[in-house]
């Protein structure tokens, strides 16, 4: 299987399955002498890990990361950084009834058609469990970006039809929904409770922002910065759409409204472009929005076929998120960090 490595200079290769022994990653191209310890990475993993609230999956994985190479006396050495996380709360028996069935809306069917074999336990390699290593790698990328004054944060901006206004950035990590609005918590709780009672799931929108960037990151034509961001975000499980800046709202805007005018004293007067023009950063905040589909693992029966092509019905057991977009926030942050640190290193190589 190819397609397990991301990046050009700062590269991340992941391996592991949902119910396998471990998850692992190799991060290559990291500059030397970056202060790094397991606690730095664990802070980010703890934001993503399952089983932290009644609003996400009840699979309880500690996601304790171990650095096995590339760090000496608390600093990166410039050699490949090896990371490993042991899976500890697998319940593979929950999936025994679907080992010969394809769950509708999942990658079961396509993996089987491509490889002629699949790990049916929790989706195997196609499971969002894989994203734990992305978040771990993203934690390292964030440390590098911080050195250059670049900060990344994300938040859940919509759950189902419930749009959530951005009020307080500091509140994002103080609630289980990663929302920036304290007043919206009760509505989010009621919505998720209602969805769970129905044995169903719901989609979500996640917004991710990068601040403190200089102008000039990114390359034309096929390596545009916004193209790289979209590529990274679309690689996240359950993401079905990505927009930059005003995104699809630009369809109804006029040019006189959408163009981001500039003055000598005030700089850019707006940021409809989301911090990117011509595939290159403007120095403004980079803003991306991701649409997460509702998970297909629900308690309601659905029509499908088995490996012999016979009609069947599937009811998914196991422990699943009623809204996968909630835990998608730290994953989106990690992928944006990986894109930006790679582009930063590429830009430095051009200038050097």
UniProtKB/Swiss-Prot annotation:
Disulfide bonds: none
Record SUPFAM superfamilies: Chorismate synthase, AroC
One Gene Ontology cellular component: cytosol
Matching CDD domains: Chorismate_synthase (cd07304)
GO molecular function, one term: chorismate synthase activity
Keyword annotations from UniProtKB, A to Z: Amino-acid biosynthesis, Aromatic amino acid biosynthesis, FAD, Flavoprotein, FMN, Lyase, NADP
Binding site for FMN: 125-127, 237-238, 278, 293-297, 319
Cofactor(s) listed: FMNH2
A Gene Ontology BP annotation from the UniProt entry: amino acid biosynthetic process
Listed Gene3D superfamilies: Chorismate synthase AroC
Alphabetical list of Pfam families matching this protein: Chorismate_synt
Family label: Belongs to the chorismate synthase family.
Quaternary structure annotation from Swiss-Prot or TrEMBL: Homotetramer.
UniProt-recorded name of the protein: Chorismate synthase
Protein source organism: Francisella tularensis subsp. mediasiatica (strain FSC147)
Name of the gene: aroC
